Amino acid sequence: MVKYPSGSLAAFRKPINKKENEIRHTYTHRKGVNFSDRGMTLEQQINESNKYYLNEEIAVVHKKPTPIQIVKVDYPKRSKAVIREAYFRQASTTDYNGVYKGYYLDFEAKETRNKTNFPLKNFHEHQIFHLSACLKQKGFCFTIIRFASLERYFVTPASFVINAWREKDKSSMTLKEIEDNSYEIKSGFRPTLPYLKAVDNFIADREREL
């Protein structure tokens, strides 16, 4: 069974005027129109969602900057430095982190054009180690997986990803496995990708275990 997050973000939304409501109605009901159709990558969808969450004071989540190795710097003036040569270094942790309802969030964003499975080689050892460390500190850790060809999105708990990655001779997670162990979310408008609905379910699951 695919787990669909329950609940609504309506309680968080500010009152909207008639004109804004008409715009939203037109946008959401026009056939085939959404941000995915406009060619947004998963990263762009998450970034847009994070802006919405921040502006609405729902959550504070940011993308971690990619570290850069500076190789050559010129100083044409004493007060000015010009970087002439630099290289992107491999990120040492994950893509995003932040706080929501007092809980620490840490997660990866991954997408594939495969239709039946997600390759585990897309996860690196340092990412698995980092997610494991955050889980030990009771953080909420997960991966947002997009099957681009299917336009399907899943919020998959890090614990499931870690176990699959560590399993000997396992090269991928099947779509069925992801369906059975994740919360599926739908792309939309305000926010573009409502992944916090899945986090609400993670929080509820933990509270039931206490």
Curated annotation (Swiss-Prot):
Presence of keyword DNA damage: yes
Query: Its domain of life?
Result: Bacteria
SUPFAM superfamilies xref list: Restriction endonuclease-like
Q: Which InterPro entries does the record cross-reference, listed alphabetically?
A: Resolv_RecU, Restrct_endonuc-II-like, tRNA_endonuc-like_dom_sf
> Site annotation (Transition state stabilizer): which residues?
K110
Gene Ontology cellular component annotations, sorted alphabetically: cytoplasm
Q: Which reaction does it catalyse?
A: Endonucleolytic cleavage at a junction such as a reciprocal single-stranded crossover between two homologous DNA duplexes (Holliday junction)
User: What are the alphabetically sorted keywords of the record?
Assistant: Cytoplasm, DNA damage, DNA recombination, DNA repair, Endonuclease, Hydrolase, Magnesium, Metal-binding, Nuclease
As to how many cofactors bind and how, the note says: Binds 1 Mg(2+) ion per subunit.
What Pfam families has UniProt attached to this entry? RecU (PF03838)
Which GO terms fall under molecular function for this chain's record? Answer: endonuclease activity; magnesium ion binding; nucleic acid binding
Instruction: Return the Gene3D superfamilies for the record.
Output: 3.40.1350.10
Name its GO BP terms in alphabetical order.
chromosome segregation; DNA recombination; DNA repair
Compartments (UniProt record): Cytoplasm
Residues annotated as binding Mg(2+) are T93, D95, E108, Q127
Q: What is its EC number?
A: 3.1.21.10
Q: Where is it predominantly found?
A: cytoplasm
- Cofactor dependence: Mg(2+)
Function recorded in the entry: Endonuclease that resolves Holliday junction intermediates in genetic recombination. Cleaves mobile four-strand junctions by introducing symmetrical nicks in paired strands. Promotes annealing of linear ssDNA with homologous dsDNA. Required for DNA repair, homologous recombination and chromosome segregation.
NCBIfam families found in the cross-reference section: PRK02234.1-5, recU
Record-stated family: Belongs to the RecU family.
Could you tell me what this protein is called?
Holliday junction resolvase RecU
Provenance organism: Lactobacillus helveticus (strain DPC 4571)
Q: What lineage, starting at the top, does this entry show?
A: Bacteria, Bacillati, Bacillota, Bacilli, Lactobacillales
Q: Which gene name does the record give?
A: recU
